[in-house]
A protein has these predicted regions:
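A solvent-exposed, acidic/Ser-Thr-rich amphipathic alpha-helical stretch
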Residues: 4, 21, 27-75
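Hydrophobic pocket/interface hotspot
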Residues: 10, 22-23, 30, 46, ...
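Proteins with a high burden of low-complexity, intrinsically disordered sequence enriched in S/T/G/P/A and R
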Residues: 11, 37-38, 76, 124
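A beta-strand edge to alpha-helix "cap/lid" segment located at domain peripheries
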Residues: 51, 55-124
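Short, aromatic-enriched amphipathic alpha-helices that serve as compact interaction elements
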Residues: 2-18, 25
Length: 124
């Protein structure tokens, strides 16, 4: 499987909220971090922490979709420009209530080793 196939498999599972399939794309010691507006909003270390976060996150959205707009690959790393759209299933704050739409554009930096994602950093 190519690195881009791995990325697309992860995104397909993410969009389907299939956490078990998502996790097959990651190595055991993986690191995930989300950076929004220059601030870290989430970080996990290891597959167990990632699974817990992924399961909580999947329940928060009625629907969610990442679309890959462009991909650059080199040195065991992929940089993907992502268009993100989601509809909340739960209230997150007074401004972000169930039914609210989220539309973001961001970049995902994915490091791959041994055919698995070992680090995923999402920037928006």
């Amino acid at each position: 499987m190519s690195n881009q196939d791995l990325l697309l498999g992860y995104i397909q599972a993410y969009n389907a909220k299939d956490v078990s399939e998502m996790l097959t794309c990651f190595g055991e010691g993986c690191v995930f971090e989300n950076i929004s507006g220059g601030k870290a909003t989430a970080r996990t270390e290891g597959k167990a922490q990632l699974e817990a976060l992924a399961r909580r996150s999947a329940e928060m959205f009625a629907s969610r979709e990442q679309k890959v707009l462009s991909v650059t690959e080199g040195q065991g790393r992929i940089v993907a420009e992502i268009d993100y759209h989601a509809v909340l299933q739960v209230d997150l704050s007074p401004d972000l209530k169930a039914g609210s739409e989220l539309k973001l554009r961001g970049v995902s930096v994915i490091e791959i080793s041994g055919g698995k994602i070992v680090r995923l950093s999402d920037y928006s």
